[in-house]
Amino acid sequence: MAIRKMKPITNGQRGMSRLVNTDLDNVRPEKSLTVPLKSAYGRDNYGHRTCRDRQKGHKRLYRIIDFKRNKLDIPARVESIEYDPNRTANIALLFYVDGEKRYILAPKGLKKGDMVMAGSQAEIKPGNALKIKDMPVGVQIHNIELQRGKGGQLVRSAGTAARLVAKEGTYCHVELPSGELRLIHGECM
């Protein structure tokens, strides 16, 4: 997966980069994991117009992403790596051995056909999800929970990664891409 740097033709494009999606699977999204996405037309939650020239844009389907990764110790096979119009990161369709299908954020290095797993039995490799206390210090992580069982809230964008700096009792020090050090409970995934 290559990253293309944009030329600074306009101020909005200065420093901008895009993923070159040459190795994505050209398949339809899983119908059971998509819902229609209603456009805001430049309105806020009261219905007041906040952006005068904002229109509907291209029709999109929202892909339901599994940010919690709560199917523990059940292996899954990566069926496809797909484009998601609603986020900068690509997504991976997982087929679990019990027959369930779920989308996850696709980390760098995940390929079609790989086996992934969430839980304490999982090894350290792209696509697996473990509790922060079970990871070695210095490893790069993404999709980090702030509260146990709430689902990933930090470091979900494409190309970003946080680093586990230290473990101290029940809490762990995580360095975010901004350079900020956060204390996160070791039971979080």
Feature-to-residue mapping (PLM):
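Short, structured beta-strand/loop micro-motifs enriched in basic residues and often containing a Trp
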Residues: 95-102, 120-126
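Basic, glycine/proline-rich low-complexity segments that contact nucleic acids
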Residues: 1-87, 108, 112-189
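Short, flexible active-site-proximal loops enriched in glycine and acidic residues
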Residues: 85-92, 102-104
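Beta-strand/loop nucleic-acid-binding surfaces
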Residues: 99-111
